[in-house]
């Protein structure tokens, strides 16, 4: 019996990225972050693009690949307790529309950032390292893998 819950999913984390309008909201949030950073005086456009990319990728890494469990009281008897949000998404099925969207978004942002920074070497290295830090954990081969035991518990 689910006392105090109003959802029909066993774990709402599995379907949250399939909610209506979530993709548009996500893209608008990235755009809003960029506009807010652009409004800071004396900061150049290349630095703003790099900051947008770094903040986005840091947030994505933290929320999708380090935070584990679910904020809800779920009747799954703790099965989601040791899984990151990325591993819970779409019940662990690989290559769904939501997973593809969340994989392509940092790549598109990386291309935009590289273009607007005019492929400056320092910006390019920072943005490439940032992109790899969010793309590598998304690989299907790393589903449930904890490298060196980091984030195991």
Swiss-Prot record:
Classification via Pfam families: ORMDL
Cytoplasmic side: 1-21, 64-94, 143-153
Main location: endoplasmic reticulum
CC annotations in GO: endoplasmic reticulum; endoplasmic reticulum membrane; serine palmitoyltransferase complex
Record InterPro entries: ORMDL
Important for ceramide level-sensing as annotated region, ranges: 1-17
Membrane topology category: Multi-pass membrane protein
Transmembrane region(s): 22-42, 43-63, 95-117, 122-142
Sequence positions bearing Hydroxyproline: 137
Any one of the GO BP annotations: regulation of ceramide biosynthetic process
Extracellular side: 118-121
The keyword Nucleotide-binding appears for this protein: no
Keywords assigned by UniProt, alphabetized: Endoplasmic reticulum, Hydroxylation, Membrane, Transmembrane, Transmembrane helix, Ubl conjugation
Subcellular location: Endoplasmic reticulum membrane
Description of post-translational modifications: When hydroxylated at Pro-137, ubiquitinated via 'Lys-48'-linkage, leading to proteasomal degradation. In endothelial cells, ORMDL3 proteasomal degradation is controlled by the sphingosine 1-phosphate receptor signaling pathway.
Family per similarity comment: Belongs to the ORM family.
Cited function: Plays an essential role in the homeostatic regulation of sphingolipid de novo biosynthesis by modulating the activity of the serine palmitoyltransferase (SPT) in response to ceramide levels. When complexed to SPT, the binding of ceramides to its N-terminus stabilizes a conformation that block SPT substrate entry, hence preventing SPT catalytic activity. Through this mechanism, maintains ceramide levels at sufficient concentrations for the production of complex sphingolipids, but which prevents the accumulation of ceramides to levels that trigger apoptosis.
UniProt note: domains: Ceramides bind to ORMDL3 N-terminus and stabilize it in a conformation that physically restricts the accessibility of the substrates to their binding sites in the serine palmitoyltransferase (SPT) complex, hence inhibiting SPT catalytic activity. In the absence of ceramides, the N-terminus is flexible and permits substrate binding, thus liberating SPT from inhibition.
Subunit relationships: Ceramide-sensitive subunit of the serine palmitoyltransferase (SPT) complex, which is also composed of SPTLC1, SPTLC2/3 and SPTSSA/B.
This protein's name: ORM1-like protein 3
UniProt organism field: Ailuropoda melanoleuca
Taxonomic lineage of the native organism: Eukaryota, Metazoa, Chordata, Craniata, Vertebrata
